[in-house]
């Protein structure tokens, strides 16, 4: 084969991988050729997220000289509108690409010596359904189908790779191998989603014996929401969330519970030295409000109605629908509460405190602070096992332990 033909083939393979979502695996795994039909039916769905941040689920090194089949297919589902499906490169400086979601639509970002582009296309796919995706090479074009419909056609671009001797490529699933800031249009990398029935250029990746076996939320029926398995937590700095009104001083938050189970901490307002100035606990389907030495309040929890917590200069009120419980406290105690917002370690925490034993799990449809929706991706810190955009349809043994 002539040198120019080899370069052209390598260019096509790079563009092919540009549009290809790869199967999630782990480092240390090897590739083997298998029957595609058997692969698609036998392999379990795999979870894409590796927690907050940009760390990928796995990183693969691909030998571009051993690609055996120029077509690929897979199914994926998510309620998450934004995140990385996969990132690939031969080097992070001038030859990388990314396939992900933004506002629920597929997006490709490409950066190399011949092209720098960003393309968003197709319908919104973050509807919780399994969407089949197929990629084929047709003459000089690459075709992409979603749900059996052609969504994208890229014509080949003539570019010589004669001075680009690398024949291997890194593929990172569910994350990035370069800083998020180096993307042409940065996004939140973590994606709460799953892939199944994936065939990759006639091959399928096999998990190593030491690979993490968690399926995340891929083996249960889902609904949209924010799910905290037992023992998980998320922490927001009070300086980073909507601030209290000042005249008069008031602060409110609202939690829309879709399901709750177990017993333990739901919410905390405090600081690093006093981690629980005000706390909401779940016990026997009842929310218990406590504030240090003050008497406790209990409110039976009705799933489906928003739970509201309101603070002002005279009281703390907990309500749900027509039911309300009020905790009257001293001005001295309330003054210390107001100072939480000026304290550098003032925080709002959801779920169990770090290291705390808790069996409570819950799903939130919404989390509002001062009338504004709070984004879990903006948390100061959060547990790896939180499902950021999905919840189980009902409590089950599968969700009583962290993944």
Swiss-Prot record:
Signal recorded as keyword: yes
Boundaries of every Laminin G-like domain copy: 46-218, 225-391
Tissue spec. comment: Isoform 2 is only expressed in the liver.
Cell compartment(s), UniProt: Secreted
Annotated keywords: Disulfide bond, Glycoprotein, Lipid-binding, Repeat, Secreted, Signal, Steroid-binding
Any one cellular-component term (Gene Ontology): extracellular space
Glycan-carrying positions: 274, 397
Any one GO molecular-function label of the UniProt entry: steroid binding
Stretches that traverse the bilayer: none
Residues spanning the signal sequence: 1-30
Disulfides per UniProt: 194-218, 363-391
GO biological process: primary spermatocyte growth
PANTHER family, sorted: LAMININ G-LIKE DOMAIN-CONTAINING PROTEIN, SEX HORMONE-BINDING GLOBULIN
Miscellaneous note of the record: A putative trans-splicing which involves HDC and SHBG gene regions produces a fusion protein expressed in fetal liver.
Subunit structure: Homodimer.
Protein name (Swiss-Prot/TrEMBL): Sex hormone-binding globulin
Origin organism lineage: Eukaryota, Metazoa, Chordata, Craniata, Vertebrata
